[in-house]
Amino acid sequence: MSLVSPSPDSNAVMAGDQDASTSQVPSQSESKIGPNVATQTLRKPTMSKVILRTVADKGVHSRVSLAALKKAVSITGYNMAQNTWRFKRVLQNLVKKGMLKQVTGKGASGSFRLGKKQAFKSKCKAKRRQRRQKPGQRRTGSRRSLLGSKKSNNRLFKGVRRVAKGRRH
């Protein structure tokens, strides 16, 4: 019995076949990495944040209906058929905390607006924005003082009008 050792050329062919087979089908570790990375980077905002954002976009004193809130939550990617109980629970908790105020209806129905706590926070943010903008406005005011104030211009026009009226008589 003679042992036939495979030639070096046959090893190369076999190795080439193995590489081709592995390159066509992704390994299990590669297929697991792909979806996990995508889900970690694309995270949805919480339901309460979505609700508060939609109510805040409407304004402090305006109302938002339950249907409009459901539509906003479903647009962000939540399945409302499966998450209706969660949606109702989040709404009721926001009302209890004082972040939302229920204008009409009972329970998790009716229309809602921002509560006092949330309205106060939004007013503080608006004041901060105004403070940031004031230095820019002061600069424009100083330029106006160099050119002349509007009050002095109005006084000049009043004097001209009086003179014109006096000449007509």
Curated annotation (Swiss-Prot):
Question: Polar residues compositional bias: what residue ranges?
Answer: 1-10, 19-36
Any GO molecular function: nucleosomal DNA binding
Q: Which GO terms describe its biological process?
A: chromosome condensation; germ cell development; heterochromatin formation; negative regulation of DNA recombination; nucleosome assembly; spermatogenesis
Q: Keyword Transcription regulation on this protein? A: yes
Keyword Hydrolase included in the entry's annotation:
no
Matching entries from Gene3D superfamilies are given as: Winged helix-like DNA-binding domain superfamily/Winged helix DNA-binding domain (1.10.10.10)
| PROSITE patterns assigned to the protein according to its UniProt record, in alphabetical order | H15
- Provide the alphabetized UniProt keywords: Chromatin regulator, Chromosome, Developmental protein, Differentiation, DNA-binding, Nucleus, Phosphoprotein, Spermatogenesis, Transcription, Transcription regulation
Gene Ontology terms, cellular component aspect? male germ cell nucleus; nucleosome; nucleus
Output the Pfam families linked to this UniProt entry.
Linker_histone (PF00538)
Q: Which residues form the H15 domain?
A: 43-116
InterPro entries listed in its UniProt record: Histone_H1/H5_H15, WH-like_DNA-bd_sf, WH_DNA-bd_sf
Its annotated compartments are:
Nucleus; Chromosome
Q: Which residues carry this modification: Phosphoserine?
A: 62, 65
> Main site of residence?
nucleus
**Compositionally biased intervals (Basic residues):** 118-142
Locate the region Disordered: 1-36, 118-154
For this chain, the family text in UniProt reads: Belongs to the histone H1/H5 family.
Q: Write out the function statement from the record.
A: DNA-binding protein that may be implicated in chromatin remodeling and/or transcriptional regulation during spermiogenesis, the process of spermatid maturation into spermatozoa.
Q: What is this protein called?
A: Histone H1.9
Organism of this sequence: Rattus norvegicus (Rat)
